[in-house]
Design a protein with these regions (language model features):
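Conserved ABC ATPase "signature" region
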Residues: 45-63, 172
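Short catalytic/signature loops enriched in Gly
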Residues: 3, 156-224
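Conserved ABC ATPase signature
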Residues: 68-72, 76
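A short, proline-enriched helix->beta-strand linker immediately N-terminal to the Walker B motif
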Residues: 87-91
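Hydrophobic anchor residue at the start of the ABC signature
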Residues: 82, 94, 106, 110
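ABC ATPase NBD coupling module
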Residues: 1-11, 37, 159-163
């Protein structure tokens, strides 16, 4: 029972919407799969209404329920993936590179949709991405991982206003600035673990301030802080 409850409370949005949607199933059946497994409805009418409601919430029409994945654009397919996760009314959604396969304009639409839903329902996201500009926009807290190690963690404000680890600093310095004057003077920092002289395995987490922690040795921290 505990495992079943956890499965319904935690849902996933995948990177490639086309690869994770069954091409032989209609959208209604794709979205309702979790409802079917966990017996969340009492009649077919209720099932249909739940699918229609969640489609409306993600900006799709009820008639889209009878279409197949190949009949949608990339952004629409990702909305179907979001609907499939949301229909279970989860407490946590793990979004694994869920916007990386989309065009920039569609990325903004999907992230705005996710934020609106979060504001409305209070659910939590574990948002996995390499685009730090989007991470900054959607996240309250950030964890920076490299080669399987958590290198730096803190609030969004702590990470972006005072990045400490060289890898974090290189990632943030690579973010383009929309201001052309600032962009011309932006210096992207280069980071290569092989030549950095760092040993992630030898480091431990050090508190910088508040909830801001950085992995490194005592000698590393003396150089960085």
């Amino acid at each position: 029972q505990t495992e079943a409850r956890l499965r319904s409370d935690m849902q996933m949005i995948f990177q490639d919407p086309m690869a994770c949607l069954n091409p032989r199933q209609k959208v209604a059946d794709i979205i309702a799969q979790g409802l079917d497994i966990h017996h969340r409805y009492h009649s077919q009418k209720e099932r249909t209404e739940m699918v229609a409601d969640i489609l409306h919430k993600v900006g799709l029409a009820p008639e889209h329920a009878n279409r197949y994945p190949h009949q949608f654009s990339g952004g629409q397919r990702q909305r179907v993936g979001i609907a499939r996760a949301l229909v279970m009314n989860p407490k946590l959604i793990i979004a694994d590179e869920c916007i990386s396969a989309l065009d920039m304009s569609i990325q903004a639409q999907v992230v705005n949709l996710m934020k609106d839903i979060q504001d409305e329902t209070g659910l939590a996201y574990l948002f996995i991405a390499h685009d730090l500009s989007m991470v900054k926009y959607i996240s309250d807290r950030i964890g920076v991982l490299h080669l399987g190690y958590l290198l730096e963690t803190g609030t969004t404000e702590e990470i972006f206003s005072h990045p400490v680890h060289p890898y974090t600093r290189s990632l943030i310095s690579a973010i383009p600035n929309p201001n052309p004057v600032v962009e011309r003077s932006r210096i992207a920092l280069h980071y290569d673990y092989k030549t950095s002289g760092l040993d992630y395995g030898a480091g431990t987490m050090h508190q910088i301030e508040g909830t801001h922690f950085v992995r490194g040795t005592d000698a590393d921290l003396e150089k960085w802080v």
